[in-house]
């Protein structure tokens, strides 16, 4: 069954394995999440648990938000997400979800929002090849064919310059190197999407081998 938790990306560091290998890891701080709601097939048409992370200031919360978390007897949360495929019987409204639901060696998928890069050209944004830079060429870093005579238009899906980054990215099959339950930390092998202090979702892998 699916397990998951919300947290913040703290940054990257490295740890030594028992055999002496140096492992680059991303540190994710996942303070206690709270189960806000259990969704069932009878009432909602599908099964899921709704979890919240990071308390929101009282004056920034509206009445519906305060009423929604009243059953869980907690403060309104800044980040609220649903986890489908979870075992509903294992959770109760108001229950805290901590990092100890995972163990060392677990394989997880991590979802975050990629760093924004601003307005970028087709080469950086889409990985296109550039044209010749010398020998009289006047085609260097442009997008390419943009509407020849016959179709007399630009085709849908043409890779063009534009805003790059700031998209939801999921990196699959990452290994949890260490679970630090005392400090609410997960050390995940490799890098995960997003800037420092950005929100990430860690849940059990859907394609784990």
Swiss-Prot record:
Q: How does it assemble?
A: Part of the 50S ribosomal subunit. Forms a cluster with proteins L14 and L19.
Q: Which domain of life is it from?
A: Bacteria
GO MF terms listed in the record are: rRNA binding; structural constituent of ribosome
Record function comment: One of the primary rRNA binding proteins, it binds directly near the 3'-end of the 23S rRNA, where it nucleates assembly of the 50S subunit.
HAMAP family the UniProt entry points to: Ribosomal_uL3_B (MF_01325_B)
- This chain belongs to which protein, by name? Large ribosomal subunit protein uL3
**Which organism does this sequence originate in?**
Bacillus pumilus (strain SAFR-032)
Which gene name belongs to this protein?
A: rplC
Please state which protein family the record places this protein in: Belongs to the universal ribosomal protein uL3 family.
Its GO CC terms are: cytosolic large ribosomal subunit
């Amino acid at each position: 069954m699916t397990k998951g938790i919300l947290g913040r990306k703290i940054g990257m560091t490295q740890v030594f394995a028992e055999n002496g290998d140096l492992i680059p890891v991303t540190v994710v701080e996942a303070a206690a999440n709270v189960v806000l709601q259990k969704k069932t097939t009878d009432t909602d048409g599908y099964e899921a648990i709704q979890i919240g992370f990071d308390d929101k200031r009282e004056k920034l919360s509206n009445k519906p938000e305060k009423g929604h978390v009243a059953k869980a007897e907690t403060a309104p949360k800044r980040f609220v997400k649903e986890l489908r495929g979870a075992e509903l019987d294992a959770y109760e409204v108001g229950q805290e979800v901590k990092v100890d639901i995972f163990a060392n060696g677990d394989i997880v998928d991590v979802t975050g929002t990629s760093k924004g890069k601003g307005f970028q050209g087709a080469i950086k944004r889409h990985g296109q090849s550039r044209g010749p830079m010398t020998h009289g060429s006047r085609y260097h870093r442009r997008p390419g064919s943009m509407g020849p005579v016959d179709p007399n238009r630009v085709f849908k899906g043409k890779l063009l310059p534009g805003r790059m980054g700031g998209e939801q990215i999921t990196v699959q099959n990452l290994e949890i190197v260490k679970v630090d339950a005392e400090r609410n930390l997960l050390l995940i092998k490799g890098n995960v999407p997003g800037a420092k202090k950005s929100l990430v979702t860690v849940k059990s892998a859907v394609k784990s081998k």
